[in-house]
């Protein structure tokens, strides 16, 4: 469903949620609203109109940013791993692999591989790194907070660092986290675990986060 927000088009997606959620998506500032299944369209529109000025400010910020150069996954490019920059070196071989060594990341790719194929292999390698690190850190945070998720998975999300389904007690972590400092992973884990107890982002939520992570604001800035 599409609605108009004072001249701004917005996509409305109905979900099994309790509260409205409005997101301005990079890189072009598209607007998406997640809404409860039975909430009237008039209520959604009224909510969106109250956010019109904020939406315009966010869109202006996004459109004024220089576009990031798209990686081609070729030798000489710089790629991030846990907040550290590595120089990519690509070689051809019969078996795909990614091997870190010093300040270099060696990507062994099939002969005549495409950019999309190399990107896909790198994404899976990032996923492996995230699973290994989160597999160690998530249980530690569960023990510290007393908040336990039923299951957790990884997903290559480009607009969110993590999500939590509090009813199913399931947490999703973005594969993109493997590019950021590991302190950011801790923040996102704690953030999503806290949603098992507090579903919104109100005062109680941030107080719960700060109880275990006083520097959460600094960590969140690293994710911008």
Where are these regions (language model features)?
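Active-site-proximal or metal-binding-adjacent scaffold patches in catalytic folds
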Residues: 1-187, 196-224
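Walker B catalytic acidic pair
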Residues: 192
């Amino acid at each position: 469903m599409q609605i108009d927000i004072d001249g701004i088009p917005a996509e409305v997606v109905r979900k099994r949620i309790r509260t409205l959620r409005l997101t301005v998506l990079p890189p072009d500032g598209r607007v998406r609203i997640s809404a409860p299944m039975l909430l009237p369209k008039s209520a959604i529109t009224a909510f969106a109109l109250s956010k019109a000025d904020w939406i315009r400010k966010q869109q202006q910020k996004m459109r004024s940013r220089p576009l990031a150069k798209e990686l081609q996954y070729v030798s000489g490019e710089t790629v991030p791993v846990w907040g550290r920059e590595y120089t990519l070196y690509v070689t051809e071989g019969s078996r795909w692999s990614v091997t870190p060594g010093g300040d270099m990341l060696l990507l062994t790719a099939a002969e005549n591989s495409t950019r999309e194929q190399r990107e896909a292999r790198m994404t899976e390698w990032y996923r492996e790194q995230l699973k290994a690190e989160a597999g160690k850190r998530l249980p530690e945070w569960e023990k510290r907070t007393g908040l336990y998720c039923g299951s957790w998975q990884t997903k290559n999300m480009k607009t969110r660092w993590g999500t939590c389904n509090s009813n199913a007690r399931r947490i999703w972590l973005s594969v993109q986290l493997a590019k950021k400092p590991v302190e950011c992973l801790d923040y996102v884990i704690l953030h999503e675990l806290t949603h098992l107890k507090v579903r919104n982002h109100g005062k109680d939520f941030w107080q719960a986060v700060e109880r275990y992570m006083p520097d959460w604001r600094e960590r969140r800035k690293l994710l911008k």
